[in-house]
Amino acid sequence: KILGERVDASFATSLKKTIIAADKEIHGVFDLIMNDYGPGRHIASVHIEVPDTWTADRIDRVTRKITNAVYEQHGVAMAAVGVYSINTKNDVAAKIHAQVSKLVLAHEGVMQIHGFFVDEETKQMRFDVMVAFGTKRKEIYKDVIAEIQQAFPDYNVQAQLDSDISD
């Protein structure tokens, strides 16, 4: 087995389906990282997108439900379930999200944008940009950030360059 080998696509898809089934308000599952320590010894981490209205109590209940379901159904121990808060209370944020997504996805090599959140009070915009391997990742990332910053000069753009490590 090769160290750092990509997670089997069907296994990753099945695991993500289990996670998203934990609650109807989970909007997406991203950044799956799985470590393989031999047969029956897998440890994983993942991010989920949830509404900005969720409480810490609800997040705790859902992440524990995910951890249990993933272990019971797949034999994978979840080291962490990270959370991306997405705007649900703000029509302005939804419009900005649509505009930013269109601009970002127009760049060749960009596969996905996720974890998007706009904070109107602090004028911050946060998201992850997944750029394909085999491309000029850092150059594409810098171009994306520059374009978004130019389109939204009043906002502080905080974008994370993300890697395509699982399906």
Q: Can you describe what each PLM-predicted range is?
A:
Residues 1-167:
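Alpha-helical transmembrane segments and adjacent TM-loop junctions that form the membrane-embedded core
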